Design a protein with these regions (language model features):
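…primarily DNA-binding HTH/wHTH and HhH modules…
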Residues: 123-140
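Short hydrophobic/aromatic patch on the recognition helix
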Residues: 71, 120-121, 125
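C-terminal regulatory or interaction extensions
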Residues: 9, 16-34
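Amphipathic alpha-helical segments enriched in hydrophobic/aromatic residues interleaved with Lys/Arg
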Residues: 1-14
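Residues within helix-turn-helix
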Residues: 58, 69, 105-108, 118-119
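Terminal helix-turn-helix DNA-binding modules in bacterial transcription factors
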Residues: 78-116, 138-140
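A short, Lys/Arg-enriched amphipathic alpha-helix from helix-turn-helix/homeodomain DNA-binding modules
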Residues: 4, 26-66, 85-104
Length: 140
């Protein structure tokens, strides 16, 4: 029982220390969030979506020299959203802008954003926006 209690106490301290680092390193975390936003902008401004596909949490964490788990926890603490949700929101924002601004077809927009299949883009868009890309374009 004594060993179990000490292990439990140790793990509790580890958990508290892990959570505390997000509070004490607030300015550093804001910098990482800015770098993440810059990484997303650079990624979608380049030809990487067409060559690599959609960015993953692991890719972003690797580019920022962080572990995927730590990166995910950091983004969740700073934004209230998971890193995956953050990436998906970025894709939706870009898709909405391209649908309204560009005179590209939905297929071209899908490939430009890194989707392998336009059907996946349409399904993804409808899940997040509530309308298909064409419906969204026609309503705005």
């Amino acid at each position: 029982k004594l060993i179990t209690a000490n292990i439990e106490l140790f793990l509790n301290y580890c958990d508290r220390f892990y959570d505390r680092q997000f509070i004490t390193r607030d300015s550093v975390n804001k910098g990482i969030l800015e770098k993440f936003e810059g990484l997303m902008n650079a990624y979608f401004s380049s030809d990487k979506p067409q060559n690599i596909g959609l960015p993953s949490v692991a890719y972003c964490a690797d580019e920022l020299h962080l572990s995927a788990n730590y990166f995910g926890d950091l983004i969740k603490k700073e934004t209230g959203k998971s890193a995956q949700e953050y990436i998906q929101n970025k894709i939706i924002t870009l898709a909405k802008n391209k649908i309204l601004e560009d005179h590209l077809s939905v297929n071209e927009i899908a490939y430009e954003l890194g989707f392998k299949y336009p059907q996946h883009f349409s399904r993804f868009f409808k899940q997040h926006v509530g309308a298909t890309p064409n419906e969204y374009r026609n309503s705005n």
